[in-house]
From Swiss-Prot:
Involved in endoplasmic reticulum (ER) stress-induced cell death pathway. The keyword Membrane applies. InterPro entries: TMEM117 (IPR029370). GO terms for biological process: intrinsic apoptotic signaling pathway in response to endoplasmic reticulum stress. It is found in: Cell membrane. Signal peptide: none annotated. This is Transmembrane protein 117. It is a multi-pass membrane protein. Belongs to the TMEM117 family.
Length: 514
């Protein structure tokens, strides 16, 4: 590999730095974000509707409860079916011809996002039914989730930690197992491949660090504002840019993959903490219902990048919070030095009265329950709010917008099958041109096996880039750089299996005749 831009962009050090910086940035923005301390109800666009639709705001009547459950169950079912057959197969596979979605690749991630979409749609259908009744306005589904912002942000922080850690670990695991950069980390690779080192390290580090992370986040054991003592305090503009760069880094992790944007390589990425690059779950076979036996198959690469796109949802919500942040909407106000204070008493948060949510009012009025000023009972944050205009804050989305454009550009121009390649989605990346005889033409060749098959390898059409493998069964042309003993073995195995499949019915027919 020549030492060009791609060499350095996809270098192991570059990939590992980006993967681990995302973890640090996510913790930093969680600590600096004033929303993380807000006592008001959390609201998340679309996701909040889905969460509220499934988990809370159930009417008292049994009939209404049954209706609601049936609607969100129907939404999940339709979402799974539409995600698999409409979005994955039709839209991504046939219409857009995206290589990364060939066969069943990426189907579970597509089905997940499709399910969210249909839960959102059915929540509005449910709202329409409630409005028709006239007396059910209190049970309307909105993007408010029924939990406090503080609790939701803690859950989001733990979720992003898990997702970012698994992603960073898989990047590290890949760097230490594969060999596109053979001169990098020789001693580390030798240690990594010894026995079960990578397996033991993963589970040990995961349980240890996750226990510490959950303990610190959920118990407020460590206070960031007491720890940093106001060192380089952030404002809404700097936090918006930080959230934007987190989105950029999420996309960079995917774009730095050696097989981006097609993901059609022959490198199997082992799942973290396991010896296998994929997991299979057998669905119970009911012959009366299903005509075939179905299995759930999850590959390491889609397991990794599927998690990234889930984390991307939380990061987008974090970016939204910074861009449209207004202190009074989150039960907060601005004190001296443009510092943010968080109101903790529930009485002041009932109506979010802007008069009571101010430094002037809370510093001059006494709480009768504590005989102290309201300010003394509020939480002081070193984070600042300078009142920047929306235009200035929206500039923070420019880096993310550029990253999304480049991401789409590479997929559109380099990650799609050509029109004349339609129908080749199921072929291996080494496929160039294939001509097969019908198996019926070989039904007379009884007893032909792999051992007595004659195979010749020649140069087709005087093109040194191609190698032709011709056997008694068929002819296949490979790119010479991809020709391996495994390809040759697979080619012969596929050829003989087709003949054997046709021989078996013929043999059975002769037995019945005799």
């Amino acid at each position: 590999m020549g030492k060009d831009f791609r060499y350095y962009f996809q270098h192991p050090w570059s990939r590992m730095i980006v993967a681990y910086l995302v973890i640090f940035f996510n913790f930093l923005i969680f600590a600096e974000d004033p929303v993380s301390h807000s006592q008001t109800e959390a609201n998340v666009i679309v996701v909040g509707n889905c969460f509220s639709f499934v988990t809370n705001k159930y009417p008292r009547g049994v009939g209404w409860r049954i209706l609601k459950v049936l609607l969100w169950l129907l939404a999940i079912l339709i979402g799974l079916i539409a995600g698999k057959f409409l979005f994955h197969q039709r839209l991504f596979g046939q219409l857009l011809r995206l290589k990364m979605f060939r066969e069943d690749h990426g189907s579970w991630m597509t089905m997940f996002f499709s399910t969210i979409l249909f839960l959102f749609i059915f929540s509005h259908i449910y709202n329409t039914i409630l409005l028709m009744d006239g007396n059910m306005g209190a049970y309307l589904i909105t993007d408010y989730m029924g939990i406090r912002n503080e609790s939701f942000m803690k859950l989001a922080a733990v979720g992003t930690w898990m997702g970012d850690f698994v992603t960073a670990w898989m990047v590290t695991d890949m760097m230490l197992q594969d060999k596109p950069y053979p001169d990098w980390g020789k001693s580390a690779r030798a240690f990594w491949k010894k026995g079960n080192v990578r397996i033991i390290l993963f589970w040990t580090v995961l349980f240890t660090l996750t226990s510490v992370v959950v303990l610190v986040i959920t118990t407020d054991w460590i206070s960031w504002d007491k720890l940093n003592r106001g060192f380089l305090p952030s404002d809404e503009v700097s936090r918006a840019f930080l959230a934007s760069f987190i989105l950029v880094f999420d996309l960079l992790i995917v774009m730095q993959d050696w097989e981006f944007p097609h993901f059609m390589g022959d490198v199997d990425v082992n799942l973290p903490g396991l010896h296998t690059p994929h997991m299979q779950f057998k669905i119970p076979f009911f012959q009366k219902i299903f005509k075939e036996e179905y299995r759930i198959h999850i590959t390491g690469k889609w397991f990794n990048y599927g998690i990234i796109f889930l984390v991307l949802i939380l990061d987008l919500n974090m970016w939204k919070n910074q861009i449209f942040y207004k202190p009074h909407e989150y039960g907060q106000y601005i004190g001296p030095g443009q510092k943010i204070y968080t109101v903790k008493d529930s009485e002041s948060l009932k109506d979010l009265n802007r008069t009571k949510l101010s430094w002037e009012w809370r510093s001059n009025h006494t709480n009768p329950q504590t005989n102290k000023t309201y300010v003394e009972g509020d939480m002081f944050l070193h984070s600042r709010f300078i009142g920047a205009s929306l235009d200035v804050k929206c500039l923070a989305f420019v880096p993310s917008l550029i990253a999304f454009v480049w991401f789409g550009f590479f997929i559109w121009f380099f990650g799609r099958f050509l029109k004349n390649e339609q129908g080749m989605e199921n072929q291996d990346k080494t496929y160039t041109r294939m001509k097969r005889k019908s198996p019926s033409e070989h039904s007379k060749d009884m007893g032909i096996t792999r051992e007595n098959t004659q195979v010749s390898v020649e140069d087709p059409l005087n093109d040194p880039a191609l190698v032709c493998i011709r056997s008694d069964f068929n002819e296949i042309v490979y790119k010479s750089s991809h020709l391996t003993s495994e390809n040759l073995s697979l080619h012969l195995k596929e050829s003989t299996s087709e003949v054997e499949a046709e021989q078996e019915p013929a043999a059975s027919q002769r037995m019945r005749t005799n």
